[in-house]
Amino acid sequence: MKAGKVKAIGVCNFLPDRLLDLILSHEIVPAVNQIELHPFCQQKELRKLMAQYQIQPMAWAPFAEGQNGIFQNPTLTAIGQEYGKTPAQVVLRWLMQSNMIAIPKSVHEERICQNFDISDFTLSISDMEQIEHMDTGKSLILDVPALDEVQRLHGIRFVQ
């Protein structure tokens, strides 16, 4: 970056300790950190640190890969019914209103179109608070600090 050849970097799965170490040790502030982020895993501590350094959170698996019954969740369903929207659309709108980038996955054309159809409603403060209360404070998909998870992500088979 100092040579001017790189204008910005992004990182993935950098937890608070790793992110702060990168910033303080290398004087590099990433533009984005792609992390597991959905109503059940809101990464509040990490997002607070990211906000201090103006790092944009990018939510991979914004639908928690379908876990915890997210598409049938009573809170998300009730909020969606108020606006004529699906639970998935409520999640995407929550992310948008929280200034988080969402990268939802779908292979179904109808759902892809629905994912874009979130600009015609705004979640109320009460709606946002209800979603905030869904946070479990832990990952559902990846245990990023676990050594076997790190090896798996690098294609290395963990042997005991």
Regions found by a protein language model. Give the residues of each.
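Beta/alpha (TIM)-barrel catalytic core signal, keyed to glycine-rich beta->alpha loops juxtaposed to Asp/Glu
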Residues: 1-160
